Amino acid sequence: SPWPRRVSPFLVPSSIINMISGHVSIKFGFKGPNLALATACTTGLHAIGQSARMIEYGDCDVMVAGGAESTVSPLGMGGFAAARALSTRNDDPATASRPWDKDRDGFVLGEGAGVVVLEEYEHAKARGARIYAEITGFGLSGDAYHMTAPNVDGPRRSMQMALQNAGINADQVDYLNAHGTSTPLGDANETNAIKLAFGDHAKKLVVNSTKSMTGHLLGGAGGIESVFTALAVYHPKSPPTINIFNQDPDCDLDYCANTARDMKI
């Protein structure tokens, strides 16, 4: 028979994405809103942004939010390689992820997770919590354009919506942790979107891609990059974008090339 003789009783539960957050809630006794998102590379960031809004709306006082991914496998590597999304600089893997460099040729697949504890401000103060940073605004959008090809309108609107939600002007932003995947189309598109969203102030921004050091964590990217951003605000210091050896003239912003920078954020 072509059919399996036995199916595990754990087959269905193990394939439901929100079982992950369910296990966390059971382990720690979390009884507030419990949900899981799956929005590809923005999963972690969407989870954090939506959790912040739940706190803002009064649905809860504390949320644990972020993203994780483990895709370094024959199937994961093969799929992205077939899509020609990965760098082929296999003879020099340490410099293969090079966002905004003229010779970038794709991203490096990474694995990992980034999770933050979000807490209502007065609640955090009352228990003497160490506060690393504050989420003041969140924006998300779609460009209704193409399944994989980038478009400037979607990210532009997302950034402008975050500014509007935060109630601040573009010139009040000092630092931007960008997507910066090291793909030829994506990095140029993101640069143009930043310039459209921030106008003349874009040239004064410090923009960096921590993917130059971690690789692309896919669903975990937004989580770990939110951690990096919070720590950049807390210390205050911009992480570098490493491996910029020959900056692409079409990517003409300040990417904090190769060296971390002390700065007010």
Where are these regions (language model features)?
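Short glycine/serine- and small hydrophobic-enriched flexible loop segments
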Residues: 52-53, 119-122, 227-235
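Flexible, low-complexity linker/loop segments at domain and module junctions
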Residues: 166-172, 202-203, 254-265
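Short, well-ordered amphipathic alpha-helical segments that serve as non-catalytic structural scaffolds
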Residues: 20, 47, 119-121, 151-167, ...
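Conserved catalytic cysteine-centered active-site region
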Residues: 1-50, 59, 82-108, 194-223, ...
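Condensing-enzyme catalytic core mediating Claisen C-C bond formation in acyl metabolism
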Residues: 91-166, 174-175, 244
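Acyl-CoA/ACP chain-elongation machinery
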Residues: 61-105, 138-152, 180-187, 204-254
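Conserved small-residue
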Residues: 24, 44, 51, 80, ...
